[in-house]
Structures are given as C-alpha cells and as structure tokens.
Amino acid sequence: MNQPFCSPVKALRSVLDAAALLPSPSPETIPLEAACGRIAAADLCARMDQPPFDRSPLDGYALHSADTAGASRETPVTLPVVMKLYAGDAPAAALPAGCAARIMTGAPLPEGADCILMQELTDSGEETVQLYAAVKPLQNVVFRGEDVAAGAVIAPAGTVLTPAHLGVLAGQGYAEVTVCRPLTVGILSTGSELLAPGAPWAPGKIYDANGIQNAARLRQLGFAVERQQCSDDPEVITGKMQELLTRCDAVITSGGVSVGQKDYLPLVLEKLGAQLVVEGVAQKPGSPMLAATLGGKLVFCLSGNPFAAAATLEQYAIPALLRAAGRREESCIPARTVCTLTNGFSKPSKGNRYLRATACGGKVTLPGAGNTEAHSSGALSAMMGCNCLVEIPAGSGPVEPGTEVEVLCFVQ
C-alpha cells in the first residue's frame, strides 16, 4: 500500500462509481407474488387508471346534486330509488334526474349522478328515500385515476419492491414482473487458524465466524452466496479466488489484508491483475480494506477482525454490491441521521472512528455500557442487536452521554 489511505467519503464514492460501471445485471421475469424484495429491472408503469371508474367511498345514495337543494331533517326531500349498485356491478343505465340510486362502498357511480349522500343522512329507504341534507356537486366521490393515473411510474427501475408496490401492481393486473437476477457473491475466509463450524476444536484454532456472519448479512439483502475457506497460502488463496470469480459476480474476502508476514491478499490481487479502487481507508476499524475490480467483477478484501470486517462490509461492500445488483444509488447508501448518545465512550479518537450501536427513537446506545473493551475490532458478541454505526470524527476527545452524534443506519 503505497498511497495514503483515503477518506471514508472518498472510499464510498469510489466503490459506488466502480459498481456503476460494471455490466448491468441480467433481467428475469418472475411471478408477482415472488417479487417482494427484488429489484425492478425496468420502470413498472400503471396500465390503467386506478380506480378505473368513479366510485363510491361509502354506503349511501347516488344523486343529482341539484335534486338535494334545501334538504334537511325538518324539510326532507323524497326521491324514488330506481336502481341498486354493489361493488362489482356495472350500471345498466344512466340515473335520471329526480331519482336516486342505492349505492354501496366500491360500486361505480352511474352516469348522470354527480354526488353521493351517506345513508346516515337518509331514512335508508329501499323504494323511496328521504334525504336529510343537501349535497354539493362531486361530494363523496372517488374519481377515476385519483389514486394512480394510467401511465404513471409505480416503481422506477432500480426500486426494491415492497409489499405496497406489489399491492399497487396487482391492482393494475400485473401477474408477473421483470426484475434483476440476484447477484451471487463469493465469500472467502482466509487464515490457517480457521476451523469450519462443527469441526473438532484444536489448540490455537478459532472457528470461522466472519464467513458465516458476512454470508448471512448478504443473504438477508437478497444475494446468493457461495462460501469458501482456505489457509494462509498465496497459491491456495489465488486458486480459490479464481474459482469463485468463475462462478460468482463478486468476491469478498476476510483476513490476510494488512501488512503482516502472512497477509497475502495485496499480492494475490496484483498477481491476478486486479484494478485497485480503494487501497486503505482512514478509519478505525477496518483501515486495511482493499476494493478492486477484476474481470468486470467487484472484489473486496476485508480485515480478519470480526467488527472491522462487519463495519467495512456495511460501509463499502454492501453499498457497492447493491449498486451492482441494480438498485438505485440512494437506496444503497447507509442513511445518516443525528441521535443523542445515551452512554459515553471514554477514548479519544485520533482518526475517524466507527462504533457499533443500536439506534431507536432519536437515541443511540453503545453496547457494553460504553466500555471500550466492547468496541475491540475482534469482539464478536457486541454486534448482536446493533443496527448502525456511530461516527466519531478524527480529533475528537472522549464522547460524553447526551452528545449529539452522527449515525449511519445499516441498509435494509
């Protein structure tokens, strides 16, 4: 690493720009019911007005407003009821002047009628009806296209489809939608000290927590994952990287990325001809992170320390992968907000520092009652329940409870 570490802002911009230059994910058409959480591959537009006709929002009577003039409980207006309309009916004829139509919620407004009087302001008659209030033109009418106009964009390309999107699309008659094919991410945990979960423990060994945690987080966001593990051997690492790059759209490694005697990832990337995008970030934890492109695919090399890996995964790898997967950029980036810190952090921060935390209701709490031990980059358990990172700017002293702090919320 010959260049000075770049700022967190520059690192994020660099990986997003690199992701935007990669080939677009291929589209696939799937059933609407299976599309929740998927990314729209093209604009999804309204095929028709919604509602498709003027309709009633309540049970009552469709009327000519002019026929209701002067109506009150003291001087009711009486009209013949000439038709009854339920949701799903199509009016067979126009409503003549001087007549009423019994109408139920959701039923189409008959031609000629220009208002609806709720049944609570009538005697609820079936053959004739007494009106106890005057009604203005267009009162109590839900108009055609009032919710969605034909041709309107319901979900722009790159939108993550939610249950609400699916409901609107179903109301437009969509049975299938075209979405981006999910990217497959290769996860490679490096380290001769690693054991696969379930293997017998041996002295000097640790279980591969990073691989499981990183893979789970990516699956949570809709990625397919292939997970591998290997020893600190540059030839083995190179072979595993090539293998994963053959089958996957991106690769994330953990471990072997710093300046130790067995930190081989920088050499492996150089050997494979990768184009470095980020060569270290000026922050703690996770400063040794590398980001590169190789054969039109993203590669992120993260620290082997669990929290350092988790933090840089959230800050840089996930935004870039989501961008490459077809998401709109604004939905790829951790949202920033300001919260009140409920407990303090006693260490000064010479450089940019990120602390795992839990934000809720405008307040943010550090794990371990703010004890600095809970924020070791090697601490695993302190990540449980966390949903954000607290940003402590370079040059800050100890942070006291009650301080307003910048918070980066994990992308969902």
Question: Language-model segments: which ranges?
Answer:
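Intrinsically disordered, low-complexity, positively charged segments
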Residues: 4-72
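Flexible glycine/proline-rich
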Residues: 9, 28-33, 37, 42, ...
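Generic structural signal for well-ordered, non-membrane alpha-helical segments
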Residues: 4, 8-12, 28, 32, ...
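Residue-level signal for inorganic ion chemistry
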Residues: 15, 60, 151, 187, ...
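Short, glycine/charged-enriched hinge/interface segments at domain edges or termini
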Residues: 2-6, 62-228, 373-374, 389, ...
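Helix-rich terminal scaffold detector
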Residues: 1-9, 177-302, 306-312
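Short beta-strand/loop turn elements enriched in aromatics
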Residues: 28-32, 53-79, 112-127, 327, ...
